[in-house]
Amino acid sequence: MELVVEPLNLHLNAETGSTLLDVLRSNEVPISYSCMSGRCGTCRCRVIAGHLRDNGPETGRPQAGKGTYVLACQAVLTEDCTIEIPESDEIVVHPARIVKGTVTAIDEATHDIRRLRIKLAKPLEFSPGQYATVQFTPECVRPYSMAGLPSDAEMEFQIRAVPGGHVSNYVFNELSVGASVRISGPLGTAYLRRTHTGPMLCVGGGTGLAPVLSIVRGALESGMSNPIHLYFGVRSEQDIYDEERLHALAARFPNLKVNVVVATGPAGPGRRSGLVTDLIGRDLPNLAGWRAYLCGAPAMVEALNLLVARLGIVPGHIHADAFYPSGV
């Protein structure tokens, strides 16, 4: 059977029953991958023509834009087909690893957010904006976004208290400095695209600030000169944290513009009142040529996704990380 890979216009012979990722890798086609088990979403690609047997989590998921999306590691070739892979400048390959670490600090960022710092026994490579699974005990395991960069001396996570949440309750009430943890990753596709030269819109709601911090620092500290508009949205003044950190970055890098947005109640000096979606719509009415990184609560991310698409960002340049609750 024949597999056509766009935009490379590459025609490959493949055996029925092979996974798409195996065929791409064996033919040295550049594609991002990590976990190889359908968890991380890194090897996502689009089916243009034909069909594949999809065993992964993309099955039944609403699709943005035209075509059907599959995870290459979970899609099995059954007939001639044509797929589209991400642009080669977006390819990242960070083999998933499990690394031991030690909690070195637990700080109170806000009334319901704790900042964890973890010293890893070995380095863990990841792209800014990705996340990892953190195991505190065999029963307490959850995914959290990295707030820093691989070059940082310690790994940082920002964890919000979830009412009735088993893991967040453990972090807030039982976890102590010196505890051993296991970090598994990296995971996720909402990572920084380094070769993009146009403007960037980075929006973090609540602890969605963690991956946004990673993305923005990754861009700035690697020398990217793109105009970056960062919006940090919170419910009220008491939910604001890392404000000085954001403004310190903006002072160092003139291409970064920071907006701290408070939805309800007084905003305070230097901040803005209202909904992030409303302010972006007024501030940036034409987003053609931009890339967007959207992180936070699902309702906010979904609303932003619709907004930025309407304002001109093509679906492939919208990178979203919605923080769905994991239950108790």
UniProtKB/Swiss-Prot annotation:
Pathway(s): Aromatic compound metabolism; naphthalene degradation
Residues binding [2Fe-2S] cluster: C35, C40, C43, C73
Cofactors (names): [2Fe-2S] cluster; FAD
Disulfide bonds: none
Short name of any one Pfam family annotated for the protein: NAD_binding_1
Keyword list, A-Z: 2Fe-2S, Aromatic hydrocarbons catabolism, FAD, Flavoprotein, Iron, Iron-sulfur, Metal-binding, NAD, NADP, Oxidoreductase, Plasmid
Spans traversing the lipid bilayer: none
2Fe-2S ferredoxin-type domain sequence ranges: 1-89
GO biological process terms held by the UniProt record: electron transport chain; naphthalene catabolic process; salicylic acid catabolic process
GO MF annotations, alphabetized: 2 iron, 2 sulfur cluster binding; ferredoxin-NAD+ reductase activity; ferredoxin-NADP+ reductase activity; metal ion binding
Residues annotated as domain FAD-binding FR-type: 96-193
UniProt keyword annotation of Membrane present: no
EC number: 1.18.1.7
InterPro entries linked to this entry: 2Fe-2S_ferredoxin-like_sf, 2Fe-2S_ferredoxin-type, 2Fe2S_fd_BS, Beta-grasp_dom_sf, Cbr1-like_FAD-bd_dom, FAD-bd_FR_type, Flavoprot_Pyr_Nucl_cyt_Rdtase, FNR_nucleotide-bd
PROSITE patterns named among the record's database cross-references: 2FE2S_FER_1, 2FE2S_FER_2, FAD_FR
One Gene Ontology term, aspect cellular component: catalytic complex
Cofactor annotation comment: Binds 1 [2Fe-2S] cluster.
Reaction it catalyzes: 2 reduced [2Fe-2S]-[ferredoxin] + NAD(+) + H(+) = 2 oxidized [2Fe-2S]-[ferredoxin] + NADH; 2 reduced [2Fe-2S]-[ferredoxin] + NADP(+) + H(+) = 2 oxidized [2Fe-2S]-[ferredoxin] + NADPH
UniProt similarity note: Belongs to the bacterial ring-hydroxylating dioxygenase ferredoxin reductase family.
Quaternary structure, from the entry: Ferredoxin reductase NagAa belongs to both the salicylate 5-hydroxylase (S5H) and the naphthalene 1,2-dioxygenase (NDO) multicomponent enzyme systems. The NDO multicomponent enzyme system is composed of an electron transfer component and a dioxygenase component (iron sulfur protein (ISP)). The electron transfer component is composed of a ferredoxin reductase (NagAa) and a ferredoxin (NagAb), and the dioxygenase component is formed by a large alpha subunit (NagAc) and a small beta subunit (NagAd).
Function text: Component of two multicomponent enzyme systems which are involved in the catabolism of naphthalene. Plays a role as an electron transfer component for both salicylate 5-hydroxylase (S5H) and naphthalene 1,2-dioxygenase (NDO) systems, by transferring electrons from NAD(P)H to the oxygenase component via the ferredoxin NagAb. The electron transport chain from the two systems can use both NADH and NADPH as electron donors at approximately similar rates.
The name this protein goes by in its record: Naphthalene 1,2-dioxygenase/salicylate 5-hydroxylase systems, ferredoxin--NAD(P)(+), reductase component
Name of the encoding gene: nagAa
